[in-house]
Amino acid sequence: LDGLLILVSANQIFDITQKLIPVNIPIFIEKPAGLVPEETKILVKLADKNGSKNMVGYNRRYYSIFHKGIELINQNGGLLGVAVEGHERFWKIVDRDIPNEIRENWIYANSTHTIDLLRLFGGEVEQINALKNSLKEKNGDQFVASMKFVSGTIGTYTSHWFSPGGWTVTLYSDTIAVQFKPLEKGIWIDTDFQQHDIM
């Protein structure tokens, strides 16, 4: 075998991956690698111990539109800030037949798609301040974080699961802003507030 794909429900990924890492065949793991951070840490240690190559499927970071947006920002003074809105439409989720374990850990099961974009655009996080609140969900359903990246860029993350909204990313330089809303569509805004499509 050249590689394995682990494409199972979020609450099964950890157990299956833990059994397959020692086989030492490269593994593509559908996100999340673990349904809670402790599970992910265990898998990292196991992979390091076995020297196995693994990749977690955060496909959105490979959208070509994002890389065009990064290029525009770099051509216009460089990245000063990144703002990610990762609102979930949780009122639609609660009526679906989703195991409680996944629902209670939705921030890891699904929201990490948008959280991952912070590191795609900003790089390694140097400092972070985070708050959470709970309207209905025991592990939180309202999240806000402000951070500074090693590069000096600052960033914010906001997510309100029971408020209408979608996923949005905005990048800031000192002369333009680039916005992805929805994530698959990009525009850039100049200092005259003119909007230009990113092709």
Predicted regions and their residues:
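Short glycine-rich, flexible loops that bind phosphorylated cofactors or substrates
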Residues: 12-13, 91, 164
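NAD(P)-dinucleotide binding in Rossmann-like oxidoreductases
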Residues: 135, 153-199
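A short helix->loop->beta-strand "cap" motif at the edges of active sites that frequently abuts
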Residues: 23-25, 50-53, 153
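Predominantly a Rossmann-like dinucleotide-binding segment in NAD(P)-dependent oxidoreductases
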Residues: 60-129
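Beta-loop-alpha module in the N-terminal Rossmann-like domain of NAD(P)-dependent dehydrogenases
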Residues: 1-46
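A short, glycine/Asx- and small/polar-enriched loop/turn
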Residues: 138-143, 149
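Hydrophobic residues in well-ordered beta-strands that form the structural core
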Residues: 29-30, 54-56, 180
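Rossmann-fold dehydrogenase core element
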Residues: 42-60, 78-83
